């Protein structure tokens, strides 16, 4: 219970022989009643609001993570109708009022040329079948190159790229990297290597409005994905790091490197 407010007054000195008794006089009572009552300052509301905001943000992030994890489970059987990258490109075209046509067709992995599968693995993630979502050797080498100021390689695996394409788009931030890192093991555990490769090849951006192996092969070479040969597969794989700036016919040097990697890997 709150304590009653105390009322203080000045001391009344009573000398011997005076007629005044040792009691409060009427004037002192009036003075005390008319004195302003001082209340203690109220604690800042910031101290109460801030923890609630932090808890609310944390709960929202956890909820979004759970939704993404459930979507990964569903992708074990359901082909993705779209991705964050697809929606991002649609939004950018709408904002800038530029024409946009999406080419996207999901096909089974069995209908994608083995040469194209091997070329993409050789170009993007040579240890795809050895790691569990993170290529620590490539991460270490990339970090070393960062320290030396000569970064020439990326360290993202196919699984990491798939998670980014599905849920986060092309933006970069520490928050996105952290969320991506927690979802990669889920994707590896739930989907498995074959399904990860299948979804990646079918949703990855291969040019302006071009998504997936089938659309890329028909857009650049006029042939279905099942009929692509080694050389054209290497050229298609060569544009993946920068699909909006590169063209297959200009990637002879890099595609030759990819072909050598394929031979070294036994393909």
PLM regions with names:
Residues 2-15, 20-267:
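Juxtamembrane regions of bacterial inner-membrane/periplasmic proteins
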